């Protein structure tokens, strides 16, 4: 390319810059902290093309799965007679709320207190203290403890 045409091209670019105008006073953002916090950007809700699971997971700990069996030893019978307390072997994953709800659902009795322990055989045992308006002996007979 000839030197004269190059000068013409530069002149045209300079003319365009003058007509357009240029920002001369760009204000710098003064940062007062040494830490940079990433700005919050727009987070859109997910709209998947298809569901990742074909069916929702079922509840594995229903009332029948929580309570495995009644515990029928002499000490358990003494608890029934003396302390109005039923003793059950329950699922290891069940907590006290699950046990209380399961006893109410299966046997229609109100539990006041639930104590749990894990036996050396790695079974969970639940001591369910019944409300004073229920008799543990009657409930045990109805269930089939005795």
UniProtKB/Swiss-Prot annotation:
One GO location term (cellular component): cytosolic large ribosomal subunit
GO BP terms in the entry: translation
Gene Ontology terms, MF aspect: rRNA binding; structural constituent of ribosome
Gene symbol of the encoding locus: rpl-23A.2
Originating species: Caenorhabditis elegans
Keywords attached to this entry: Ribonucleoprotein, Ribosomal protein, RNA-binding, rRNA-binding
Name of the featured protein: Large ribosomal subunit protein uL23B
UniProt family annotation: Belongs to the universal ribosomal protein uL23 family.
NCBIfam families the UniProt entry points to: PRK14548.1, uL23_arch
């Amino acid at each position: 390319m000839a030197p004269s045409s190059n000068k013409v091209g530069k002149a045209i670019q300079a003319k365009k810059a003058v007509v357009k105008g240029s920002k001369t006073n760009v204000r710098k953002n003064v940062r007062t902290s040494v830490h940079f916090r990433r700005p919050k950007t727009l987070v859109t809700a997910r709209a998947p093309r298809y569901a990742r699971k074909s069916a929702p997971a079922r509840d594995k700990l229903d009332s029948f799965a929580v309570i495995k069996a009644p515990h029928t030893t002499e000490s358990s019978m003494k608890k029934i007679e003396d302390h109005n307390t039923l003793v059950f072997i329950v699922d290891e994953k069940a907590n006290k709320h699950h046990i209380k709800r399961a006893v109410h659902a299966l046997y229609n009795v109100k539990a006041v207190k639930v104590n749990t322990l894990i036996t050396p055989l790695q079974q969970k045992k639940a001591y369910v203290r019944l409300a004073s308006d229920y008799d543990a002996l009657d409930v045990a007979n109805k269930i089939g403890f005795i």
